[in-house]
Amino acid sequence: MGNLLEYSGIITKLRAMEARLLTDEQFEEISALTSITELVSYLNANSSYQDVLQDMDETMLHRGNIEKVLILSLYHDYTKIYRFCGQSQREFMKLIMKGYEIELINYCLRIVINHYKKPFDLNYKSAFFDRYSQISIGKLITARTTDELVENLKETEYYAPLKKIKDTDNVTLYDYNLALDLYYYTSTWKEQKKILKKSDLELFMRDRGSKIDLLNIQWIYRAKKYY
């Protein structure tokens, strides 16, 4: 009965949050908008993002700031769900956190490999990652080369797959991205079997399998177009 009550509480929480998500039809409407101002007005009127957008100064309404606010909203939702979970469900939440970590590492790789003059813009993510992640943003932002970036991940699970790629010849950003994607899906595929029970596992594997298929299509397209 305890597990049933625990899950029912989470389901109630998630359904309440889901009810505030944008629908497919609303995304179609958004795609027809022509400016950031129109987008913000639409989100303020039609979505849960009103909570984080309504107080933004008009001078701050440009793409970079909007993306930051929406990402922080995502992290806020993760935090709300995580706090509501029991220990077993938190193990599942850690699998989701890995996706955020991969995105962070890929962002940093683009900065150092492409030698962007723009510095790392990650301070707004620090509080969230300090609380839930094995990655130290404070260490990552000191990197100026791929060697330094990989070494700054030495205390994490991502060090081994990245070092293996780093030590090969003529490595590209594409190679790093592919290595991280492969590691992410193979590791979470194994871990999910330890965490989830049969019905939950089947649902998660179906979802994860679809994402792997889409990723394969994406990589095939990129390989044909650029190589």
Labelled PLM ranges:
Residues M1-Y227:
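N-terminal domain-start signal
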